[in-house]
Amino acid sequence: MNYFDNKIDQFATYLQKRNNLDHIQFLQVRLGMQVLAKNIGKLIVMYTIAYILNIFIFTLITNISFYLIRRYAHGAHAPSSFWCYIESITLFIVLPLLVLHFHINETLMMFLALISVGVVIKYAPAATKKKPIPARLVKQKRYFSIIISTILFIITLFVKEPYTQFIQLGIIIQAITLLPIYYSKED
C-alpha cells in the first residue's frame, strides 16, 4: 500500500468508528475516497500537462463541456485506470492541440457538434455494466442530457473563436462515449 492508500484507510476507519458503519458501509466509504483520490490525481496530471503546453484554458473548456453532459448522459468508461489516463490525455490534451494548431473548419465542427447533440438525444443516458442507472432516474437524466447539450450548442453560436470549437469538442467527445459500439465490448 502507498502513502495515500494508508491515509484513506485510516480516515475510513475513523469514519467507521465515529459513525458506527458496518463493514459494507466502511468498504463503500473507502472505495469512494479511493476513486476521488485517483480522479484528483488524473486531473492534476492532465491540467499540468495542459499548462505546460500552454493550452490550459482550452483543455478546461473542453473538459467542462464534456463533464456537464456526462454527468447526466453517462457513457463508456476506460477499462482500467491506466487507460483512463491515456484516454484523458488523448481526448483533453491531444485533441485540443490538434483543433488549435490545425484550424479545423468552423462549419465542420458546427456540423459535428450538431450531429453529436442528435446522438445525445438518441442514446442518453447510456448505462454501463459497472454503472447502471436506476430506472427511476433514466427519464430525468435523459431530459437533462438533452437540455445541457442543446444549451451548450446554442452557446457556441454566440461565443467567439477559438472557444466555440472547444465547447463543440467537449460535446463531440461525450457523444462518442454514448455510441452503442462500446457496450458489446464492455460486457
From Swiss-Prot:
It comes from Staphylococcus aureus (strain MW2). InterPro entries: AgrB. It is found in: Cell membrane. It is a multi-pass membrane protein. This is Accessory gene regulator protein B. It comes from the Bacteria. The chain crosses the membrane at residues 49-69, 82-102, 107-127, 143-163, 164-184. SMART domains: AgrB. Its EC number is 3.4.-.-. GO terms for cellular component: plasma membrane. Pfam families: AgrB (PF04647). GO terms for biological process: proteolysis; quorum sensing. Belongs to the AgrB family. It is an enzyme of class 3 (hydrolase). Its main location: membrane. Keywords: Cell membrane, Hydrolase, Membrane, Protease, Quorum sensing, Transmembrane, Transmembrane helix, Virulence. Essential for the production of a quorum sensing system signal molecule, the autoinducing peptide (AIP). This quorum sensing system is responsible for the regulation of the expression of virulence factor genes. Involved in the proteolytic processing of AgrD, the precursor of AIP. One of its GO terms (molecular function) is peptidase activity.
